[in-house]
């Protein structure tokens, strides 16, 4: 299993219960993926993940951490050493806005920012702590990760936190509860505001926005924002956090092993296969965010469990074929 996030852990759980030895690899030093290194501690106590590790290890699951597949271990070796492989590496590639100023000092991507805060709480050595104490902060984006950044900055002691989103509140992709929590804690929302530039010479000085108005709906039912001419406005800020979401980051070795992708890099499952979550390489299974894009933890867990059931059936059928061949 590649990836010790929700999908990988769920897969390991079900495989072990079916008598299959599960080895879980992850590039981080602790299991959990975004459960550990993305979701803030005020939303998920980290000792819950540690307890889950103890339970899984007690069941027989083996964790190989601080190990990146394709870097520390070649995927070729994986294919030689294991009877089946599950990919649950999630989506960690940050989406950018594509506007001027994103590389200025004081601009941070959401996940490294959240990660640094969690590692500071863990007292991780050599952690580059990103602290918003006393700062005016603008968070760009309207999903749950944006809300995590808002609330984390406030807990660090930020002077002011703005959250800017190019649509209105009704069209936000994030949880209504998360927005409500952010409001109650003091976040000021800037609705119908689209960033077009992060301004400053070397360091962030503010964000230039244009107002938007909503028109016809897109294929997902959300109204499409269009720019209001002459509505440019600069809001001053000491720091900017970009939280536009994540997308898959396909590995270099995918093509070699016939791991097929859709137009945005998500792994495609063989829908005609009788084994759930099997890719177009019969030995490789995949689930979670790698298949459907950034989604809920419960969805990743569901797909990890489903993939384990597919792997169990695949290995069972292969064992029967091997026995039949041996008896010929």
What are these regions (language model features)?
Residues 1-24, 145-154:
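N-terminal Rossmann-like FAD-binding beta1-loop-alpha1 element of flavoenzymes
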Residues 2, 7, 50-99, 197-204, ...:
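Feature captures the FAD/FMN-dependent oxidoreductase FAD-binding
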Residues 7, 29-30, 92, 145, ...:
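Conserved Rossmann-like nucleotide-cofactor binding loop
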Residues 24, 28-59, 150-197, 319-328:
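Rossmann-like dinucleotide-binding cores of NAD(P)H-dependent redox enzymes
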Residues 54-71, 94-156, 263-275:
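Glycine-rich dinucleotide-binding loop and its adjacent helix/turn
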Residues 105-134, 217-294:
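FAD-site-proximal beta/loop scaffold in flavoenzymes
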Residues 131-167, 233-239, 245-247, 265, ...:
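Long hydrophobic segments that form regular secondary structure
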Residues 149, 290-315:
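A conserved FAD-binding loop/helix module that cradles the flavin
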């Amino acid at each position: 299993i590649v990836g010790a996030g929700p999908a990988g852990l769920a897969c390991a759980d079900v495989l072990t219960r079916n008598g299959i030895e599960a080895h879980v690899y992850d590039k981080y030093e602790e299991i959990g993926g975004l459960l550990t290194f993305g979701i803030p501690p005020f939303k998920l106590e980290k000792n819950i993940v540690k307890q889950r590790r103890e339970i899984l290890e007690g069941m027989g699951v083996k964790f190989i951490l601080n190990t990146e597949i394709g870097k520390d271990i070649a995927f070729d070796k994986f294919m030689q050493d294991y009877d089946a492989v599950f990919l649950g590496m999630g989506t960690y590639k940050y989406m950018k806005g594509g506007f001027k100023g994103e590389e200025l000092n004081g601009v941070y991507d959401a996940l490294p920012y959240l990660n640094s805060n969690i590692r500071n709480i863990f007292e991780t050595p050599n952690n580059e702590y990103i602290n918003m104490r006393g700062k005016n902060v603008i968070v760009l984006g309207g999903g749950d990760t944006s809300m995590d950044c808002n609330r984390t900055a406030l807990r660090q002691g930020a002077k002011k936190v703005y959250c800017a989103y190019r649509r209105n509140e009704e069209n936000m992709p994030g949880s209504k509860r998360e927005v409500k929590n952010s409001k109650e804690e003091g976040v000021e929302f800037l609705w119908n505001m689209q960033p077009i530039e992060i301004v400053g010479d070397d360091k962030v000085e503010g964000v230039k926005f244009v107002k938007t108005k909503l028109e016809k709906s897109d294929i997902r039912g959300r109204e499409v924002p269009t720019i209001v001419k002459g509505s440019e406005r600069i809001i001053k800020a000491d720091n900017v956090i970009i939280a536009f979401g994540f997308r898959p980051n396909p590995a270099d070795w995918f093509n070699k092993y016939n791991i097929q992708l859709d137009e945005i890099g998500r792994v495609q499952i063989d829908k005609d296969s009788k084994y759930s979550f099997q890719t177009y390489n019969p030995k490789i299974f995949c689930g979670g965010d790698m298949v459907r894009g950034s989604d809920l933890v419960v969805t990743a867990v569901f797909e990890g469990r489903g993939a384990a059931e597919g792997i169990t059936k695949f290995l069972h059928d292969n064992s029967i074929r091997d026995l039949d061949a041996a008896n010929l």
